[in-house]
């Protein structure tokens, strides 16, 4: 980054509204989690994505583990996660390492997510299941939510392959199945390169088809240039496929290489969006500037 680029990015950070600034949490809680994660050479999206809520979540005994390495095979224009080069081979011991970390941290609720791994035979679906099994062996009282990619691409690409991979995870019975559509239909192309809006809806629809008892969840980030009408359309699309839970948060630009923020939505606007979502029938809604997809997940 050049000096002028650095100055530009610093000015953008300075211009962020006050409601997006908050303390990160107790240093002792952060360092404990970071030490255990580093010792086991595993990853959390809390750290890789620099989540502003990680201190609060750690204090509430929740965390979101990032499976299959920190490098994604896709190049979404909003995401902080590493991308642009070949990902690492899978660690066959990762499930056990995550289970041990859950035990040491005394976590009551765990979210498992992953980078997209289009290079793998089953996109990593079996790795999710293996990790869930390992966690349950050591932590039988811990609930597990999954936040998955769309499982499209690679060998066996297409609807049948996607269905088979999702079925594998549904049969492992997560406490909640989350897949984020991230943005409105019009902006999916520029925001989520390599993803398709209807393909993401299909993920959540398949979960309900395979097991209607499993709660489904999705998330939207605002600030890309969407309108309220487009957000209502997206929420309607989610309700039409039986999606139960919704999170809405503010997009914050991680670097100059990412999409610029078009608008900072106010807390009052988030309250309005949350009210609309609840009126549509979502059973659990989190809508606020700093909300992320796993925010207060254990309270749902």
Curated annotation (Swiss-Prot):
Cofactor (UniProt): [4Fe-4S] cluster
PROSITE patterns given in the database record: RADICAL_SAM (PS51918)
Record's catalysed reaction(s): [[Fe-S] cluster scaffold protein carrying a second [4Fe-4S](2+) cluster] + N(6)-octanoyl-L-lysyl-[protein] + 2 oxidized [2Fe-2S]-[ferredoxin] + 2 S-adenosyl-L-methionine + 4 H(+) = [[Fe-S] cluster scaffold protein] + N(6)-[(R)-dihydrolipoyl]-L-lysyl-[protein] + 4 Fe(3+) + 2 hydrogen sulfide + 2 5'-deoxyadenosine + 2 L-methionine + 2 reduced [2Fe-2S]-[ferredoxin]
Cysteines engaged in disulfide bonds, as pairs: none
Start and end residues of each Radical SAM core domain: 58-283
Binding-site list for [4Fe-4S] cluster 1: 46, 51, 57, 294
Predominant localisation class: cytoplasm
Biological or metabolic pathway of the protein: Protein modification; protein lipoylation via endogenous pathway; protein N(6)-(lipoyl)lysine from octanoyl-[acyl-carrier-protein]: step 2/2
Cofactor note (record): Binds 2 [4Fe-4S] clusters per subunit. One cluster is coordinated with 3 cysteines and an exchangeable S-adenosyl-L-methionine.
Family statement: Belongs to the radical SAM superfamily. Lipoyl synthase family.
NCBIfam families per record: lipA (TIGR00510), PRK05481.1 (NF004019), PRK12928.1 (NF009544)
Name the UniProt record assigns to this protein: Lipoyl synthase 2
């Amino acid at each position: 980054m050049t000096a002028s680029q650095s100055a530009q990015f610093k000015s953008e950070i300075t211009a962020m509204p006050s409601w997006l600034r908050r303390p990160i949490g107790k240093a002792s809680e952060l360092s404990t989690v970071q030490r255990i994660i580093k010792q086991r050479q595993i990853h959390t999206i809390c750290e890789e994505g620099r989540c502003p809520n990680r201190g609060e979540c750690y204090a509430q005994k929740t965390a979101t583990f990032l499976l299959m390495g920190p490098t994604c095979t896709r190049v979404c224009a909003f995401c902080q996660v590493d991308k642009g080069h070949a990902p690492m081979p899978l660690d066959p011991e990762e499930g056990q390492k995550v289970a041990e970390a859950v035990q040491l941290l005394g976590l009551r609720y765990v979210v498992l997510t992953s980078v997209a791994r289009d290079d793998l035979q089953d996109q990593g679906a079996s790795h999710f299941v293996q990790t869930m099994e390992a966690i349950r062996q050591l932590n039988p009282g811990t609930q597990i939510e999954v936040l998955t990619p769309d499982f499209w691409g690679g060998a066996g690409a297409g609807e049948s392959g996607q269905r088979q991979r999702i079925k594998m995870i549904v049969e492992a019975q997560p406490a909640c199945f989350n897949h984020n559509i991230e943005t409105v239909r019009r902006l999916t192309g520029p925001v989520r390169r390599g993803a398709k809006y209807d393909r993401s809806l299909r993920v959540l629809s398949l979960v309900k088809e395979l097991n209607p008892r499993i709660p489904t969840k999705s998330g939207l980030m605002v600030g890309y240039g969407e309108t309220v009408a487009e957000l209502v359309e997206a929420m309607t699309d989610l309700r039409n496929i039986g999606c139960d839970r919704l999170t809405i948060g503010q997009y914050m630009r991680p670097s100059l290489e990412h999409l610029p923020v078009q608008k900072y939505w106010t807390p009052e606007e988030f309250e309005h969006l949350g009210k609309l979502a609840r009126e549509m029938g979502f059973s659990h809604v989190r809508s606020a500037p700093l909300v992320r997809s796993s925010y207060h997940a254990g309270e749902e």
